[in-house]
Amino acid sequence: MSSEKVRASHILIKHQGSRRKSSWKDPDGSLISATTRDDAVSQLQSLRQELLSDPASFSDLASRHSHCSSAKRGGDLGPFGRGQMQKPFEEATFALKVGEISDIVDTDSGVHIIKRTG
């Protein structure tokens, strides 16, 4: 196994099909349960457009919109290696160059935009 590590930040939007339908922002899950995957993707697509015109706003947008508790750190997940994240998330992150922002990535947790930071 490679000891290569990456560092990334992300914005997670959960939806009806997410593995866990609650988050630090929506503890009882009422908003998440009412959100379709298409709604979640639409929300991320508009955030992604904002990010493409202003990449520096990533941590601010993550803090305001992400359903992951990493939002409290501007979406920062810290460094991780292969096998530590869900496969689609890992593959997308390792494929990015530092500073690049991913397309929409689907996992059991919901839909994500990922920014590789290291």
From Swiss-Prot:
Like all plant Pin1-type PPIases, do not contain the N-terminal WW domain found in other eukaryotic parvulins, but contains a four-amino acid insertion next to the phospho-specific recognition site of the active site. These extra amino acids may be important for mediating the substrate interaction of plant enzymes. Three amino acid residues (P79S, E91D and A95G) differ when compared with the partial sequence of purified protein. The existence of two or more genes coding for this protein is not exluded. Keywords: Cytoplasm, Isomerase, Nucleus, Rotamase. Residues 1-37, 61-84 are annotated as: Disordered. The keyword Nucleotide-binding does not apply. The N-terminus is blocked. Residues 3-118 form the PpiC domain. InterPro entries: PPIase_dom_sf (IPR046357), PPIase_Pin1 (IPR051370), PPIase_PpiC (IPR000297), PPIase_PpiC_CS (IPR023058). It holds the Pfam family Rotamase. This is Peptidyl-prolyl cis-trans isomerase Pin1. Its EC number is 5.2.1.8. Belongs to the PpiC/parvulin rotamase family. The keyword Disulfide bond does not apply. It comes from the Eukaryota. Inhibited in vitro by juglone. Gene3D superfamilies: 3.10.50.40. Residues 12-22 have a biased composition (Basic residues). One of its GO terms (cellular component) is nucleus.
